[in-house]
């Protein structure tokens, strides 16, 4: 049953152990130039990627709001009307359009200022649940996402984290490993949408069926000036820099519709030719793929237990645990808590940084405009950068406790942090233009002790779940 309630103002004080919890907020949008973490303080980085939520939709946390987090309780539609955000379940059955076209609809770019006016969310295509209107103007029932609130209140919450791209999951996951969705090195084009695969195949990368295509967008923001291409790209990724430097990595993702396949929209390496390698029985089977891509997302829990965590890990959920509107069963907060608790309760806690983020805004209302919408220019990213806000939590013994970061971040910031941590060169894409999260850390502070995150479902639930993994969205 879908619960519906209009959000009203909330005043709350959180008391922990008899002491008032005070969150510190920091403003500003300049790119940080401070140095990377001291050698050895961070030896492992884990990037947990959830799906399709905006900050206003997912983080109506009264504690964060009271502390100054930039979270709105209402929005403006294309008619100039104020719409109060309405409460809905995390697993509510609707899935707004989140294509590049949907970005343009919600953005309503001003020809005068070159900024999004953020008054077009009502123009996004969506089929709302029966009896509900304006479902794009909604927020998730806080009781269903309390693990996220607990983590964000304890460590660092970034309220100005933006997806780098202006579109859906497949290109977003390319930016999360490469800082680009360009088809080749040096190209000024970007893959801008989820691929059109033949017959609805789950494989949307280099192992997609013949005839599959993905749209390209040019520096003018035009998706029709270039013919669509097969969704298989060739350029450097962060994994190449790691391997060249002798660093280890793994990419954990559930298998797809059939044994041996993967949910391609959500798996960055599948669309990179030199990682996918040879195609065997319609599936990537190259040496890089076989060595580093693990088609079982819960294997990260086992690897932590067995002291086999790699230096850099990406963690992709099943559809049910993804938070993706219309696909999730609401178990996402427990899934994330399981991974965080596994690390926190292990020896890895002492030298690990965990980033929890969401791959795109999901077509859901958010009131903060992107920092720049680059069109008709010679600057990197022109035509497809930047997208809307997505949540981000930074978890580490060296993360600032109870801190709200209002510095501008994007997916390139994650790459840049990893580059600095392991003394890697820059890829020269989104990472080159990004900050490195240095405002979120204090490497001179006494390391924070880990505080276990309460959640409705424990790690055993996910380890023992024998249901076939659900596939990603195909829109």
Question: For the regions a protein language model found, what residue spans apply to each?
Answer:
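N-terminal pro-sequences and low-complexity stem/linker regions of secreted or lumenal proteins
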Residues: 26-475
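Bacterial N-terminal signal peptides that target proteins for export
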Residues: 1-11
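Bacterial N-terminal signal peptides
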Residues: 10-23
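Short, low-complexity disordered leader/linker segments with a strong preference
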Residues: 4-6, 22-30
């Amino acid at each position: 049953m879908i619960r519906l309630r209009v959000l009203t103002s909330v005043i709350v004080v959180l008391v922990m152990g008899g002491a008032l919890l005070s969150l510190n907020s920091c403003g500003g949008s300049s790119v940080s130039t401070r140095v990377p973490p001291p050698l050895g303080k961070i030896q492992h980085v884990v990037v947990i990627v959830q799906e399709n939520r905006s900050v206003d939709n997912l983080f109506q946390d009264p504690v964060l709001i009271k502390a100054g987090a930039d979270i709105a309780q209402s929005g403006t539609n294309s008619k100039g009307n104020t719409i109060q955000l309405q409460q809905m379940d995390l697993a509510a059955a609707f899935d707004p359009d989140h294509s590049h076209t949907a970005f343009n609809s919600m953005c309503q770019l001003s020809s005068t200022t070159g900024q999004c006016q953020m008054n077009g969310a009502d123009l996004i295509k969506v089929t709302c649940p029966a009896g509900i209107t304006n479902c794009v103007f909604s927020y998730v029932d806080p009781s269903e996402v309390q693990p996220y609130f607990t983590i964000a209140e304890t460590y660092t919450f970034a309220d100005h984290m933006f997806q780098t791209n202006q579109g859906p999951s497949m290109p977003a996951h390319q930016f999360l490993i490469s800082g680009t969705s360009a088809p080749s090195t040096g190209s000024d084009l970007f893959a801008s949408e989820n691929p059109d695969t033949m017959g609805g195949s789950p494989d949307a990368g280099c192992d997609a069926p013949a005839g599959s295509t993905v749209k390209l967008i040019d520096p003018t923001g035009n998706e029709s000036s270039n013919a669509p291409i097969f969704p298989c790209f060739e350029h450097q990724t962060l994994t190449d820099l790691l391997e060249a430097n002798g660093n280890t990595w793994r990419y954990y993702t559930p298998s797809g519709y059939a044994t041996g396949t993967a949910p391609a929209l959500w798996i960055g390496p599948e669309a990179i030719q030199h990682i996918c390698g040879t195609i065997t029985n319609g599936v990537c089977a190259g040496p890089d793929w076989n060595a580093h891509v693990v088609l079982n997302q819960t294997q990260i829990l086992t690897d932590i237990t067995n002291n086999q965590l790699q230096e850099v890990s990406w963690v992709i959920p099943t559809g049910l645990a993804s938070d993706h509107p219309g696909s999730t069963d609401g178990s996402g907060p427990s899934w994330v808590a399981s991974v965080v608790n596994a690390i926190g309760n292990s020896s890895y806690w002492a030298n690990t940084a965990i980033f929890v983020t969401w791959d795109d805004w999901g077509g859901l209302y958010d009131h903060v405009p992107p920092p720049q919408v680059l069109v008709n220019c010679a600057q990197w990213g022109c035509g497809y950068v930047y997208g809307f806000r997505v949540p981000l939590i930074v978890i580490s013994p060296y993360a600032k406790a109870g801190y709200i970061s209002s510095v501008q971040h994007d997916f390139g910031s994650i790459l840049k942090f990893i580059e600095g941590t392991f003394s890697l060169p820059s890829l020269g894409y989104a990472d080159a233009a990004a900050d490195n999260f240095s405002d979120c850390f204090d490497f001179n502070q006494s390391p924070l002790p880990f505080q276990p995150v309460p959640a409705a479902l424990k790690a055993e639930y996910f380890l023992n779940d024998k249901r076939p993994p659900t596939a990603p969205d195909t829109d």
